[in-house]
A protein has these predicted regions:
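An N-terminal assembly and electron-transfer interface module characteristic of large anaerobic redox
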Residues: 1-365
């Protein structure tokens, strides 16, 4: 979020990891924290500590941010902290600043929306309905700018549409324009929850177009996109269903040829080298494993902690056609002591795959 800072309010034991993450991302200048001491828990004044701590941080800044992503933590839940009072007081003290409600509460990850889902929703909460900017579409919840060669971006460009994304916003004004899109698109599974809430709040349509390794699913997603673009055109410019189908078939046929050629080229280089991959590289690790196996690659292990409902079909397919494929849960306690080396060369796709396999050959995006 442009022109925003993050403020974490938590104990110093948890703060260590947060500080290291900020440093790793070279974002320390946008990061501040308020330490909660044991006496604050005993005295029952966590609300005051949070309010005064955040106030102190903001008063010390030479330039006030447009927004503050305020992260409360598990302690606030355990002690029944009145967060509405906290945010209300801060908004009264700093009316020119937008306070975004964020939560660092891993204890809640088994119930309801996950911390990741709640954060991807929260960063779009400041957007308002306002006007609708014709010929613009907003991509919601992505960490990186969509590649210029992506199917979605090229199809939108061919239809004269502009795609807006939060990672591409350079200032607060550009960020606020995200709410003006004709409709919203989300591609990343944890972003779907927030995108649906945003679309409902601003009375827009939302298209969920997740990344897939199945050609038929990709084609259907692009068909949905083209049909939605068609409804936004003037009546005299609307193409009939047959024209859309022909356009889509030609586009997909061309892209499949390119994809198959790229897969063949990669197979010629990698050969029969064992491949391990994880869920952090792509939200559909089983789909990636299935695609590679169908193209002759030697995939041996997938590191994941759960199977998404979106991958049920490919999971069932793998059970039948590749029952020897190993699925390893990264959160199992035994993963701390299992050997992390192999006798043969292994290609790891994703950081966790590289860590648990001990591979020195890593593909990471």
């Amino acid at each position: 979020m442009p022109e925003a800072i993050q403020i974490y309010v938590c104990a110093d034991n948890c703060m260590r990891g947060v500080v290291l993450t900020a440093a790793e991302m070279n974002a320390a200048e946008r990061f501040s924290f308020v330490i909660v001491e044991e006496e604050n828990l005993l005295n029952g004044n966590l609300e005051d500590v949070t309010i005064e701590g955040v106030t102190d941080v903001l008063k010390k800044l030479e330039k006030k941010p447009k927004a503050v992503l305020l992260f409360t933590v598990c302690l606030h839940h355990f002690l029944g902290c009145d967060l509405e009072l906290v945010y209300g007081e801060l908004e009264a003290r700093f009316p020119e600043i937008v306070f975004v409600r964020c939560y660092m509460d891993p204890i809640m990850q088994k119930h309801g929306a996950t911390p990741d889902q709640k954060l991807r929703k929260a960063i779009y909460d400041p957007l308002t309905a306002g006007y609708i900017d014709k010929k613009t579409v907003t991509l919601v919840g992505s960490d990186f700018v969509l590649d210029k060669n992506s199917d979605i971006k090229r199809l939108l460009k061919n239809k004269g549409y502009t795609l807006r994304e939060i990672p591409a916003c350079k200032n607060w004004e550009e960020y606020q324009c995200l709410g003006a899109g004709e409709f919203f698109i989300s591609c990343y599974p944890p972003a779907k929850y927030g995108a649906e809430m945003l679309a409902e709040r601003l009375n827009r349509k939302h298209l969920y177009l997740p990344g897939s390794f199945d050609y038929r699913e990709i084609k259907e997603e692009l068909r949905k996109l083209l049909q939605e673009l068609q409804t936004g055109q003037e009546q005299e410019n609307i193409s009939d269903i047959k024209t859309i189908s022909e356009e889509l078939e030609a586009f997909c046929k061309r892209e499949i040829i390119f994809c198959e050629a790229a897969a063949g080229h990669a197979k010629a280089i990698i050969g029969d080298t064992s491949i391990v991959l994880d869920y952090l590289y792509h939200p559909r690790p089983l789909g990636l494993a299935g695609f590679l196996l169908k193209h002759g690659f030697h995939v041996t292990t997938v590191y994941l902690d759960s199977v998404s409902p979106e991958e049920k079909n490919v999971f069932d397919w793998l059970k039948i056609h590749h029952p020897d494929l190993e699925l390893c849960a990264t959160i199992q306690a035994k993963m701390r002591v299992l050997p992390r080396h192999t006798e043969e060369k292994v290609l790891a796709i994703g950081q966790k795959a590289a860590w648990f396999s001990g591979s020195l050959s890593l593909i990471h995006i």
